Structure formats: structure tokens, C-alpha cells
């Protein structure tokens, strides 16, 4: 190696990483991109090799493979002139295709706020979920930024769930996911015993260049109809959620015993005599956190013990790869798909009562005013003194004599825990954290697996105590990593965008409300608004709209703070059994603890690891994706179950609130049931209706009739579309009568039409007038 070559390699900021992976390293992808960017023009392969002083045959071959891989991943574009160019220099985008049931689609591009529109004819070249390279194609007639597909970089959708049909001797599968806009052709030799109408899984075959007709092989027959549990099986496959542990993982976990070995307990702080207890819901099966609190001076000392999952799940082991790919456990209404095998999630890693367990401990000191004044982390062994439930603890705090007698030794500690909670709650309000009181629901199933009733979930003080204790441990963990400049996955929550802020303020103005803070409202401003409206009958609606105005919390290597919690740093530490980000944080903390004791290695004997920032950056994107994937899948199942429930109520009348207003109708959320349905614009009164997006309302052009977000209404259930997971309603009355025709109403309507975009006049032509609507009116949905 020449001196010039050595010096150039040393300029690569990722050289050490490459050296750890390869004995004879080549420049990193990042450095190759920098070289091409600095050249200010596309480069052929020889020019790149010369610029990087690469002459060794093995390294030339390695570079050829790396450049091809970078091309496949969309980092580089190989032009017709056989040169490598940067996509952004060619004005190209990399992104994920999101299909729409109407046949068009959108391109989600990392780092871009708005999605790009993919017209129907371009969607014929791709499929929902594809990772593609696309080129801007101007604006469509509605002013949306349109793209043209250049190349499919990765076909991510390998398997599709749907119903199998036969027609004129041809077999095909109609996808259950409406975002997949085309049927899948199944040749006779690939039906594998599937019969007409069965729910099947079809595996897509290699696509042709034109991709005119997707072809597949039936690999699994799920059943003849929607049997019990079928909705979960479909959602798992629709969202590509891993739900069966590979044989290699099953083999790997066989080495674990039911009890913690004495060898594993060595060198740990012994907390077995400390009366730590778990407090969870009645139906909880895995217990990954335990708490104990005692008075300390004028304040308190709090121990939060978390299952030491990282001791068993070692980095890059077969088990770790599977946990990483899953990202998190998925909680369906009637089934759990765990991140870890049961021997760990319900066994060795679960802090079950009266058994020794390994744990990571965050021991904290809190002032009388609820401020975290000191903390320390360490590895320990514990023995849970009791498995308590939220209901039991709440009753004990309320004075239940029978329970207080049964758990007499624990009651004093629980009372201190409650006093601590009150101080933490006061400190939370003092810093201005947004305190949402969202209504969650629980499905009660009958023996057939169908919903018998839907109940709201009540969060008592015991549940809130644990939430505050966990949040404090998360704060301490994030602070520990930030203080030591150790790469970590932070739970970040960005400030609201200007667009969403403006929209929310317009909504508030309709209710005579304001959000203080000018262009940059603080968390305290939002909290003050919620406090102001909490006694109003429409407070749930206002809170929902406030939630929509905020950004989504995600995992990220860059710590920008958590807006909603009003915190400078926050991370997830307390649930490593069910969340991979927590597992990575445990590894980082263990590494720092070992480093403080003089250790020099990146790994520790108990499962610690020093991640690089780049590794964390990739993990942040991945874990945020798996979290969204789980949310989408559970929402899909809940929607299906709600529709199934509503099938027994077609023709029934219910009260509800308008929860969303669109150009094609109103969505109404039913009181008590919390089920949403659509009142299509074609079913409204005999008038032309215009959508006022700014003020979230539909306005009758002639009558002045208005339907507004938050209006209380009475509806009739008209139809249930189980295949689309949608319910149709019709309006039969409104508790707050909409403003009807009259001089004032008409003038207001005219004023609104003048304020609407000019293209509104074009829409008016297609607005639906009841007397002109036949039974064949298509029900346009978004």
C-alpha cells in the first residue's frame, strides 16, 4: 500500500468500522458518495478507483460489488453513459410506494414532509410497498407534485393475502389489502389445492420488466371463510409481521433453563431482600418492571428494576437478529405476537413473584417537589415480593381492609409510592407537559371469538403511578447516555409544523378558543389550552384535534428532545421484553458501566455493547417503522372486529359526534361504542355541498345548512362492508341544529364559496344532488 493510498483511506471517517468488518477494507459507502459529490460530475468505475487509489485486484472486485449494491439500494444511479451519479443531482427520489384503493398512489420519501403523487398509469409498474427510484414529472391538474417511476430498487411485498377465484378456467387472487390495486394471476399448476372463495396466501413470482400482470404461487390456505382468529392471520401477512420463530431460534433457546444459574448472579448487586413488586393489569403475562419506594430525607428514594433481557439476547446472535427484525411485540385485541420466545418473555426475563431474576436497576433520588436529583444504574439480582394488579393497589390506597391486611408489609411502601406520584405529577404540570386523557376501549369476546360488548378502559391512580415511575427511569437513562456522549436511540417528539399549527388555530377559532405562544407555542401553551377546555362537553374533540396537530414521536439517534413531555432528553428503557430500542439502551448503559470500571472492549461479559452513531441512525429508522407497522396491523384488526360487531346492528339508531369532515362526507364516532362510520355526501339533504377544509365543515350552497366537526348527531346504520372494514351511516337528526336557509345563512354560504379555491366551481359540477342520485351512486372513499 502506498503512502498516498494510506493517507486517503485515513480520510474515510468510517475506516475503523470497515476495518472491524473486513480484513482488507475498501472505502465506506459514505466516503464513496463524498468523492463523487466532490467531483461535481458523474464518474465511471475506473475514475472512482483512480480517485480512491485502489489497485489491488481483490479490492477492485470488492469495489465492483459495493458499487453495484449502492446502485441496487438507490444510493447511486448507473446512467446510460455507464457513469455513477448521485440521485439528488439527477433530481431523483428514493422512496416507498403507498398504494390507494382508487388505483393511484403516493411516494413516501425519507426526509420529505409531503408525499409525492403517483398516477394510475405509473402504479401499473409498481406495487404497494415497493422501494423505488422516481423522477419528478411536474404538477397534475390538481396541483399535486407528480413522479414517474424510474426503477424498482426492492420488491418488498413478497406475500399477499386474498381470496381465490376461478373464472373461465383462470385462477386469480383478489388481495385483501385494497392498496394493492391488481389481482394476482395463479396458473393452474400453482393453485396447490386452493378452492373457489378460500382465503389464501400467494407468493409473488419474479416480475417481468413491464410488470403488466403479477403472477403468484399459492403457498398457504388459511380457510374457507372468516373463521375465529382469521382477521389476525390476515393482518400479520398484510403488514409483513414475523409471527413464527424460525427453527434456528427454537433450537437456540433450548439451552435456557427455567431458573437463573448461580453463575449468572455473580458480580451483581443483591436486591433479593428489597421488597420490589410488580404492578400490572389483570391480564398481563410478562412482567418486565418492578418498583419499590421509601422515604429519604424530605423526598424519596425510588428503585425501578427492569428485566435484564440483554444478558440473554446477545448482539448478532440468532435470537437477536429475530428480535431486531420484529422490533417489538404486537398486541392484538385477542392475541399477542411477542418479540421474544415464550421461555424468555414469560419465563427467564419475566419478573415473576418469588423467583430470582436478573435485572437492570435505576436507583433514583427525588426531592419533595418531585425533581430527580440523583440516580445510578447497576446490574442486580432480585426476587419479586408480590405480583400486584392496578385494581388491587387502587383499592388498597382507597382503604380496602381485606387487601390491606393481606399485603400489610407492603402497604407502607405503596403509600410512599402514591405520595411520590403526587409530587411527580405536580412537577410534570409545573414544567408544562401535555397531559392527554384519551379514551381507550377494550373488546369483551364471547366463546365464538366475536365481540360481545365494547368497554372503555379506565386508568386508575395505580396505573398512573407506574407510568410516572417508568417515565422517570426513562428520563434518567436518556440523561445518562447524553451526559456520557454515548450513541443511543432517543424517543424524540418534534415541535408542530407551521402548517398544522395554522390549521389547528383555524379550528379553535370556530369554538371561540385560542392557542397562545405566537409562531412558536410551548408545551405549556398546549397544556394550558387543555386545562381550559377540560370541563367542556366537546373537550374530547378538541383534544383529538390537538393531537392531530402534533408530530408523531419516533426513535432517532439525534436527540432533539420530547416536545409533548417538555423534556430535553427522553429514551425508552423500561420494556426490553417487548421493545427492541429498550434492549439497545440496556446494552449501551452496560457498556458505560464497564467503561467506568476500566474496561476497554466494545462488548461486555453481561451483554453490553458500544454502538456507533451510524448503527443507531439505522436502528432509529427501523424501529420507528416496526412500531408504525404494529400500529397499522392492530388498527386493521380492531376495525374488522368493529365491523363484524356492527353487522348485528344494521338498521339500528345511535348517537354520535362528527369526528372528521371530508369532501365526500362526514365521519361520525358513536358514543360509548367509539366506532366510526361514513355519512356519504350523497345521503345529505337536497343541496350542493362544498367542503371548507380550513374550518372543517360542509356547507349547503342553497340552504346554508352546515355540518361541522364536533356536531352531535343521530344516525342510522345503513350497511357494513366487512371486506373494506367500513360502516355506512345516514343522518336522522342533529342535537345542535345546523344553520338553515335564510338571508344570513345564504350570505355566509356565498362568502365561504368566494373564499374557497377557484377550482371549487369545477367540483360543484360533480357535487352530489340527492334527487339526481340513483342507487348506483359510487361511494367514493379516501
Swiss-Prot record:
Transmembrane segments: none annotated. Keywords: Cytoplasm, Exonuclease, Hydrolase, Nuclease, RNA-binding. Disulfide bonds: none annotated. Residues 268-594 form the RNB domain. Residues 736-782 are annotated as: Disordered. One of its GO terms (cellular component) is cytosol. It comes from the Bacteria. It catalyses: Exonucleolytic cleavage in the 3'- to 5'-direction to yield nucleoside 5'-phosphates. SMART domains: CSP (SM00357), RNB (SM00955), S1 (SM00316). It is an enzyme of class 3 (hydrolase). PROSITE patterns: RIBONUCLEASE_II, S1. GO terms for molecular function: exoribonuclease II activity; RNA binding. One of its GO terms (biological process) is mRNA catabolic process. Residues 744-757 have a biased composition (Basic and acidic residues). Its EC number is 3.1.13.1. Residues 651-732 form the S1 motif domain. 3'-5' exoribonuclease that releases 5'-nucleoside monophosphates and is involved in maturation of structured RNAs. Belongs to the RNR ribonuclease family. RNase R subfamily. This is Ribonuclease R. The gene is rnr.
